[in-house]
Structures are given as C-alpha cells and as structure tokens.
Regions:
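Short loop/turn segments immediately following the C-termini of beta-strands
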Residues: 75, 83-85, 155-157, 163, ...
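Short coil/turn segments that connect the beta-strands within blades of beta-propeller domains
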Residues: 75-76, 147-148, 197-199, 254-255, ...
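Asp-box/WD-like beta-propeller blade repeats and closely related beta-sheet repeat scaffolds
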Residues: 126-149, 154-196, 207-210
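Residue position within the beta-strands of beta-propeller blades
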Residues: 79-81, 152-153, 202-204, 258-261, ...
Length: 421
C-alpha cells in the first residue's frame, strides 16, 4: 500500500492540459501540509518495462548502486554514474514528513560513488565486460568526454581524468577543474554536458530550497547554469532562476543547449509544471519569485516585481511533479519513423500528489530544432497496481548503434531499448 498524507482540495483535474508550450495553469492551491503519496517499491519479477511495438527492451546492467546519469563513449562503451548525495537538514515539520514519504519510494542500497563501464562490442544486448572504471567519488552525477578527458560533476566539484575510450580503468588522481556550489546541497545533483565543439562545458546546479525559505544568502550561485571554458577554466553564469536543471543536452540540429528542470512544490497537484527548455544566454526563469514566466508565487517574501518582470517562459511543459531527471536527443536519424528527431526524457515520478505522475520515459518530437507536438510515452510499466517497479533517471542515446539506455535507480538497473531485429 502506498504511504499517503492527504490534504483538502488535492484532486487533479484530468481536463487540464499539463504539457506543451501553453499548459493550463490552475489557481494556486496552497495547503498547510501538501498532499503526499509515494508508490512503494516492488520487484520486476522477470517482467520488463513496456515499449512501443517494433522495439525490444532488456536489462543491460543489474545490481548497480543507484545509477544516475550515463555517457556513451565514441567506441560504444557505456559509463554509468552511481551515487547519492545531499545533506540538507529539515527545517519544518512537513519537511520531516516529506523526507519519510520520499524514502519509502527509494532504493535501500547505498550509493556506489563510482563510475561503472559496460561494454557490448557486438551490440547484441549482452555485455562482454563490466568493470568499475573509477571509484571513491563524491556523489558523481553528470558526465562528459572531450579530447582525452573524462569530466565528472560531483556534488562539490567538477573534476576530470585523463582517459581514452577503450580504457577499462583509471588509476590517475582526479584533476579539479572548478569548485561547484555545495553548501547545504538541498538539491545536490550537478548536471553536465559539453558544447558541440567541445570548447565549453555546461553545469547545472539546483536551488537550496523549495522557494527560498532558507534565505536567499544560501542561494548564491544556485538555480543556475554555468558555462565553463574548457581551456582556461573560466566560468560565467548563463542562466538564473532555473530551479533545478537536472539534465543538460545539446540539440544536434542547432547545437543549442537544452535542459529539463524540476519546478517548485506545494502549490497544488497541477502546479507547477516541470519543463524542457532551451537554456538562453542571460535568461532569468523566474525562481523563486514567479513560475512559468511571470506568474507570481504569493508565498515568496519579500515579493520582487522587478525580477518577475524579467522572467521568461520556458519552452515546453512536461507535467507537474513528474520529476524529469534524464534528457538526451536522437542523433543520426534516431530510431527513424516517428522517433527520428526529438528528445527522450526520463521521469522519476511524483511524491506530492495523490494521483502519481511521471514514472516513465517520454519522447518529445522536434522539428527544425524546436518541440513540435505532444509528448509520447516511450517506456512505461514502471508503476503497476499502485507499486513502483522502477524509477527512470538518466537516458542516453547511442546514435551509431540505434540504442537507448535508461537508468532506473529503484531497481538499480540500466535498461536497453533497441529496434526489434
């Protein structure tokens, strides 16, 4: 049975459109204690997620230690970041309750704090090699490979290792590229990707609170995306007010940077939509003062109408509380057909609404480098009979082998999706 904390007026309206460029935004429904419901874990029992007709899905790697983000190397090896971070203390009684609720839906496995390498050289879905590439890391999350270096975004620093595809181990110590904001670490994950030409790295850092309730002093350099010059290490902030940019990726037809973002809680089951957006240089996305552009959050004190007036709207709503954690784009024609151009998005799933949202991988079609249509369920079945069998995190597309990998940090599995042969 799901562990639940109910509150008045917590039902969702199925008639509201929660996705796309123009989502319906209902009235604010603030309650003393927000509705909370987590689906308890259950095993797969030999079953797998459900994928569209014409595709197959299989377990590529099992018994991992909290797989998060992944990286497909030029030679096809798959790197898997494993770990758990964060150490923010609870401030309010409802924070304690929320922490208890969330734990019911998480794995009890201790995070590996490592990167695992898996090799399937002949692309038959059965790896020939699995090994720990490097361990003793500090909650690794984002990964990037550029010009002989593997970059790892830990919860407190961006580090790099001298590395060439084909290696199966790293013995040299990490070189620190730059410190990353790590005070409190309410949102500890640090997303990472490289620019198309490899000259720049991008790091996303989440906020230290829901809506600034810890004070704005601890939000310095939080809720941001940084651009880091790979040659000099110099960094600059390119986006602010972007509450929790959990995954970054380059759209391949335009070479522009995109992110999935987790929005704020406790305004009701259908506020605020998590979103997919192009990360625009100099943009302010509203947090904490407003949401979805210039919709003012009445809870934030003091109010800041000047900042609200600067806020821009994101590009594409994904639904409220879906907890989008994974993002990658199809390349080299993707899977072809309906899945040739667009974004794969891993949705970890909700904890603060009575009817669950997320718990799946969706496909957002693109045309001319922009979202072009409603999201399509691509991998489902992570919820069954009110229980969670898995929770998607990172997604990684191999454009050469036409394979999509999905990290599942509840069953500690990486799933492999490919066209049926």
């Amino acid at each position: 049975m799901a562990l639940t904390v109910a509150s008045c007026g917590n039902a969702s309206d199925p008639k509201l459109n929660q996705t796309g460029a123009t989502p319906d935004l209902p009235k604010v429904n603030e309650t003393l204690v927000p509705p909370m419901k987590i689906s308890p874990p259950a095993g797969w029992n030999g079953e797998t997620p459900t994928v569209p007709q014409g595709f197959t899905i299989s377990a590529f790697a099992t018994d991992l230690k909290i797989p998060r983000q992944m990286l497909v190397l030029p030679n096809g090896d798959v790197l898997i970041a494993e770990g758990r971070g964060g150490h923010a203390p609870a401030m309010r009684p409802k924070d304690v309750i929320a922490g208890v609720i969330k734990k019911q839906g998480n794995t009890k496995i201790k995070g590996g704090n490592r990167i695992t390498l898996v090799r399937d050289a002949n692309n038959d879905g059965t790896p020939e090699l699995r090994t720990v590439l490097v361990d003793n890391l500090d909650a690794p999350y984002g990964l990037a490979y550029v010009d002989g270096y593997l970059y790892v975004a830990e919860q407190g620093a961006l580090v790099r290792f001298a590395f060439q595809p084909g290696q199966t181990g790293i013995a040299t110590p990490a070189e620190r590229v730059t410190e990353l904001p790590s005070r409190i670490n309410h949102h500890w994950t640090k997303s990472l990707t490289a620019s198309a030409d490899g000259s720049k790295l991008y790091v996303g850092t989440g906020s230290n609170s829901n809506i600034g309730e810890r004070g704005m002093a601890v939000e310095e350099e939080r809720a941001t995306v940084w651009e880091i010059d790979r040659a000099t290490g110099a960094r600059r902030t390119i986006a602010t007010g972007i509450r929790n940019p959990t995954a970054l990726a380059i759209e391949p037809t335009t070479n522009l940077l995109w992110s999935v973002v987790n929005e704020r809680d406790e305004l009701g089951p259908q506020l605020v939509p998590d979103y997919l957006t192009q990360v625009r240089d100099g943009a302010f996305y509203g947090w904490p003062y407003s949401y979805w552009g210039q919709n003012r959050d009445p809870r934030v004190m003091p109010q800041n109408p000047e900042m609200v007036a600067k806020a821009i709207r994101p590009d594409y709503a994904l639904g409220s509380h879906v907890a989008a954690l994974g993002l990658d784009f199809a390349r080299n024609g993707g899977f072809g057909g309906s899945f040739a151009n667009g974004a794969f998005i891993g949705m970890h799933g909700s904890w603060n609404r009575q009817d669950p949202s997320g718990y799946k991988v969706v496909w957002v079609p693109f045309n001319a480098g922009r979202p072009a249509g409603q999201p399509v369920d691509f991998a489902t079945g992570f919820l069954k009979d009110g229980k969670a069998r898995g929770r998607p995190v990172g997604v990684a597309f191999d454009g050469n082998k036409r394979v999509l990998f999905v990290a599942d940090d509840l069953s500690n599995t990486v799933w492999r999706i490919a066209p049926a042969r």
